[in-house]
């Protein structure tokens, strides 16, 4: 375990109010038999360690860490729906590319920064810069004339950076200690990686003369952000991986390995730990060109990664004059930031029917997940690279809808590990067919149904809801169980369960 990364249990463990209260019934034994004190305390501590504290935080099923047992259900990766073009090449400075976008909500607007290319990749002179766009709804975008950077004799453009380095990855720094004139930060890649700061996200300057990362290669969209869960800055950059079994469609040609993702952390954004490769267990070694890693705000226990998977052994569409290979988008998740769950090896986004996506480097997930309606998350993907039709297209998916626990017509069930929660009600994000259903049972740590919360006490639940409270015959109040070790049993038929949480 990386010493700079909190463990799963350390993130979730809920402290009891009093060790004495927890072991009051054992006090006489401990006084009469002091030799047993270590045994009793060790047993109690081990039991407490086995309980996962979820508090009132939303829990997903992107990994199996909460699951004790399943019967006739499976975890399923879902796929976003292709929508309209969000950004495309319109201006002279965008002629040969719009790509590597970062977007987030900032107050009452959505903001985006993206790379533009004024000359064709591989041709000279080549000029890669950073442009800016904004939106009121996260769907329709405008490119304001900012008057900051001169291009071909005019500042009538939306450019915000043309200095050293390209592939800017900005973020709003929510570190309480951040200086007002450094409220926005970014990293850019020249040959090495440099840090930038800004008071407003538009006017940028170098944070330091020297680069923050020099352990090349970095030719990718390297990402950095302030992580409120870890209370430190985190970066995910390009790396090279040489271990493990080579995945389907891959070949070792990049310095004897494949392109991979590395991670580092910092307390001050200037001084960073050594870059460390992410770990994916025994999953096959695949080439990850970009990473688009983000802390999922609706369920902040989870980091999600959407790397562009580069199948370098595949031939592109006939007549393609540039490089070999094709891309799709993969899906990974992590709770500690270094160990990523790789259960789902199939693509999250395929190239699809658009033939402009069937060549190398032509499908990159951009960094950012925007909630554009109560029932919709928007994601963005660069497509048609090196073509006049190069674009950043919007995709949508239901909130928390990346992975579900799914039961077929014949039904099945899931039992969680022991959990400890806070709150008064249990909320589910679910979808059933017209004949599908859910029932929910709450058990004690040992698997015994609790009075009033047994399966027989829960009327059938059906429909399609993002955040609906579970009701039993006696009502929906579960506050009497808060702070105790409980298990949740979900019995379901022709249904998907995306997430659950406890709350008021």
What are these regions (language model features)?
Residues 1-26:
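N-terminal secretory signal peptides that target proteins for export/translocation
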Residues 5-7, 32, 128:
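Residue-level detector of alpha-helix boundary/anchor positions
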Residues 6, 41-43:
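N-terminal non-cleavable signal-anchor helices
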Residues 10-12, 21, 31, 172, ...:
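Intrinsically disordered, low-complexity regions enriched for glutamine and histidine
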Residues 11-14, 42, 206:
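Juxtamembrane/membrane-water interface recognition
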Residues 28-41:
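Bacterial N-terminal signal peptides
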Residues 46-504:
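Carbohydrate-active catalytic/glycan-binding domains of CAZyme proteins
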